[in-house]
Curated annotation (Swiss-Prot):
This is Putative cysteine proteinase inhibitor 11. InterPro entries: Cystatin (IPR027214), Cystatin_dom (IPR000010), Cystatin_sf (IPR046350), Prot_inh_cystat_CS (IPR018073). The lineage of its organism: Eukaryota, Viridiplantae, Streptophyta, Embryophyta, Tracheophyta. Specific inhibitor of cysteine proteinases. Probably involved in the regulation of endogenous processes and in defense against pests and pathogens. One of its GO terms (biological process) is defense response. Keywords: Plant defense, Protease inhibitor, Secreted, Signal, Thiol protease inhibitor. It comes from Oryza sativa subsp. japonica (Rice).
Length: 120
């Protein structure tokens, strides 16, 4: 069996390059979305999540204020993890909530995967 030291070096270099790539660069990894305040799509996703949460019959009756942070995961469409500043009409307070919203290829609307009060 012939040996190919050059091929081995190329293979090792490729493995090293892949190993040092951050997880955010992988398909399926979560990527931070910069400038969420100026990103109209992300603000719409956050507002939709609050509206959907209210439709589910919760007693919170939240009012959307703004998305303060977001990440995107590209899969078959996109998943958005959004941190939402919302006002509670019942509690008379503003708190942060974390929602995961799916925007699937071929779907006509978003899907709310989770919505919960952010932990500190």
């Amino acid at each position: 069996m012939a040996r190919h030291p050059g091929l081995l070096l190329i293979l090792l270099a490729a493995v090293a390059a892949v190993a040092t790539t951050s997880r955010a660069q992988w398909v399926g990894g979560w990527n931070v979305i910069e400038d969420v305040a100026g990103n109209n799509q992300i603000q719409r996703v956050g507002a939709w999540a609050v509206g959907k949460h209210n439709q589910l019959g919760t007693n919170d009756r939240l009012q959307f204020v703004r998305v303060v942070a977001a990440e995107e995961q590209v899969v078959q469409g996109s998943n958005y993890l959004v941190v939402i500043d919302a006002a509670s009409s019942r509690k008379k307070t503003r708190e942060l909530y974390v929602a995961v919203v799916a925007d699937l290829v071929g779907a006509t609307t978003y899907q709310l995967s989770s919505f919960k009060l952010a932990t500190k």
